[in-house]
DNA sequence: GGGCGCCCAAATA
DNA sequence: TATTTGTGCGCCC
């Protein structure tokens, strides 16, 4: 389920439910997701209290005295907090039970996600990540400067997590539409002015999506703890043959780097 | 830098 | 019933 806004909403939903909660039991319902889930979490996290929850890129970082639990939701992961007696659902692979009688469960049908642990909070997977798109370091000159001499297409470029994190397939399409840039354009062949516009569009699109997701938070701990995708805000993604908001021509679908791209041939140049 | 493949389920043919 | 497609991303060539 996750792109950056969905992970951010998950984080915000978790904060009031699990901060300061003490772990009574850790359950691994299977040994691995994308990678092995460390078995020693069962002993390491026992009786540990959750201190903070942060997000870096699409990783959730849940901090304990003993170290940091690193969770990635992959393509289909979601987290919910339920009463401990709630029957376990299919694909709920990992569970943290708390002394207050609730349980945080990770559901991930495709199992592309990950549950990892780091004593000092650092991790190989976090080392080579680019800047956060909603922070000030992602400024108007950043993409322009990073894109010089890049021959790959601009969509792939903004989806490169070594450059900027958290821009997935949906919001890459949406941002390029909002900025009126053709996704097939070579990254190194886009002007400083257009990158400035694109930068603001990425920030706007992500911020809007987080805002839309915020409305789902009151239901976060209910039966459906999955905030889902905020489809009401999408202008091009999944909109093949639908009408462009601006010029009324048809949105088309192409394939780039084995991923679907949706765009308006007339508006995006 | 491009493409593969991990895995399951829903949509489509 | 069989095939295609999908919100991610590390790894291999």
Swiss-Prot record:
Cofactor binding, per record: Binds 1 zinc ion per subunit.
Example of a GO biological process term: base-excision repair
Keywords: DNA damage, DNA repair, DNA-binding, Glycosidase, Hydrolase, Lyase, Metal-binding, Multifunctional enzyme, Zinc, Zinc-finger
ZnF segments: FPG-type: 235-269
Binding residues annotated for DNA, in chain numbering: 91, 110, 150
GO molecular function, one term: class I DNA-(apurinic or apyrimidinic site) endonuclease activity
Reaction(s) catalysed (UniProt annotation): Hydrolysis of DNA containing ring-opened 7-methylguanine residues, releasing 2,6-diamino-4-hydroxy-5-(N-methyl)formamidopyrimidine; 2'-deoxyribonucleotide-(2'-deoxyribose 5'-phosphate)-2'-deoxyribonucleotide-DNA = a 3'-end 2'-deoxyribonucleotide-(2,3-dehydro-2,3-deoxyribose 5'-phosphate)-DNA + a 5'-end 5'-phospho-2'-deoxyribonucleoside-DNA + H(+)
One Pfam entry name: Fapy_DNA_glyco
PROSITE patterns associated with the record: FPG_CAT (PS51068), ZF_FPG_1 (PS01242), ZF_FPG_2 (PS51066)
SUPFAM superfamilies: Glucocorticoid receptor-like (DNA-binding domain), N-terminal domain of MutM-like DNA repair proteins, S13-like H2TH domain
The protein's Enzyme Commission number: 3.2.2.23, 4.2.99.18
Active site (catalytic residues): 2 (schiff-base intermediate with dna), 3 (proton donor), 58 (proton donor), 259 (proton donor)
Cofactor(s) the protein needs: Zn(2+)
Role description: Involved in base excision repair of DNA damaged by oxidation or by mutagenic agents. Acts as a DNA glycosylase that recognizes and removes damaged bases. Has a preference for oxidized purines, such as 7,8-dihydro-8-oxoguanine (8-oxoG). Has AP (apurinic/apyrimidinic) lyase activity and introduces nicks in the DNA strand. Cleaves the DNA backbone by beta-delta elimination to generate a single-strand break at the site of the removed base with both 3'- and 5'-phosphates.
Subunit structure: Monomer.
Homology family: Belongs to the FPG family.
Protein name: Formamidopyrimidine-DNA glycosylase
Originating species: Ruthia magnifica subsp. Calyptogena magnifica
Gene behind this protein: mutM
